[in-house]
Amino acid sequence: MDDMDISACNAVARLCCKLTQCVAVTIICLLPPSVIAIEASGEVAAAAELAGPDRSERLLAKARAEGKLNLYATMGQEQISVLAAEFEKKYGIKVNIWRANSESVLRRAVTEAKGGRFEVDVIESNGFELESLHIEQLAQPINTPHAVHMIAEAQPVHREWIGNRANLFVFAYNSQKVNRDELPKSYADLLDPRWKGRLAAESDNIDWFFTVGQALGEERTLKLFGEIVRINGVQMRKGHPLLASLAASGEVTAVTATYNYFVDKLRKEKSAPVAWVAVAPAVARISGLALSRRAPHPYAAMLFIDFMLTDAQRMLPSMDLIPASRSEKALPAGVDWKFVNPAELVKQSEKWSRLYQQVFAGAAR
């Protein structure tokens, strides 16, 4: 195991320690791989590598024999419930959903595996958490003919997860308080004194900040946002839904980076005066699906993954979600989207978390 692998594994170990609120932790990736790796069962490996002209028929027959699957998901409860219901209607296979935030899903998957409890079949989460499962050797490499239809950023080389949708980090603003001609085109535009006292930011936006840093360079990024904080101040709040709601209500005028989904939902469902614009460097993040190495219902799990890469892709836009399928062409055009690199983020997450806190430590609260 090389130094970069150890660095990535130690980052995951620290994250899992934080999530489980442990007092002390053995850096798990310094242990022999046999201690931390969960070996796939024969049926899981067979389901994951199923191929041939009759793959669909064999997969469906074995999936129906299993009759159900267990899903840990981070997608919104309403959205994942609709997708699961459509899957159940089409195939007659029950989907048991446990929905939580990405940190909780990762914590449960890791904790159960280390305790020898194997209940989950499919984990649906953000790229960072899925890459963490890869490092922990809890996810099974999968072979699905539908992977080739996803954008390149949704296809990690190791094949231990596959992306099915994208989240956009966007500049959100109250459309009654900000004129269109005021909107920034790049983050450097936020140095303008017109933004003094008008900006808010998420208190833990590490994946966004890391990717901006990758695009602009570390030194330039730290200097730029340090100056924005010094000149104009930034209110720090916890939670992307909260930030979108605060912009909609006018309690804050604008948000440096939040998810497009929450803004679109407020505007669509409540006719709220909130909108968004992509600001350079514009950041996008992939979310996806992983198959547990000890999935109790591996064929049903693979059938569900196939469904999420096909039928579900056509359903996502109506839910204000962005499919990862090339054929859907759902990413807003005319924008040079910089995708979060989950593998690199896992290796550098501790560093960029520290830098983020340093830059925004003096922000107005």
Protein language model regions, located:
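Short, polar/charged alpha-helical segment
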Residues: P53-R64, K68-N70, T74-K94, S318
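Extracytoplasmic ligand-binding site segments that recognize negatively charged/polar headgroups
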Residues: N70-A84, N96-A113, R117-E251
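Short amphipathic alpha-helical coupling segments at ligand-binding clamshell hinges
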Residues: L83, R220, L224-E227, S287, ...
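A ligand-binding cleft/hinge motif common to bilobed small-molecule-binding domains
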Residues: E129-S132, T253-P273
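Short beta-strand->loop
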Residues: A139-H146, E160-G163, R267-V283, S292-R294, ...
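A bilobed periplasmic-binding-protein/Venus flytrap-type ligand-binding module shared by bacterial periplasmic
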Residues: V170-K177, G213-A215, R285-A300, L316-M319
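Periplasmic-binding protein-like
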Residues: W195-D204, F307-E328
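Extracellular/periplasmic bilobal clamshell ligand-binding domains
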Residues: A330-R365
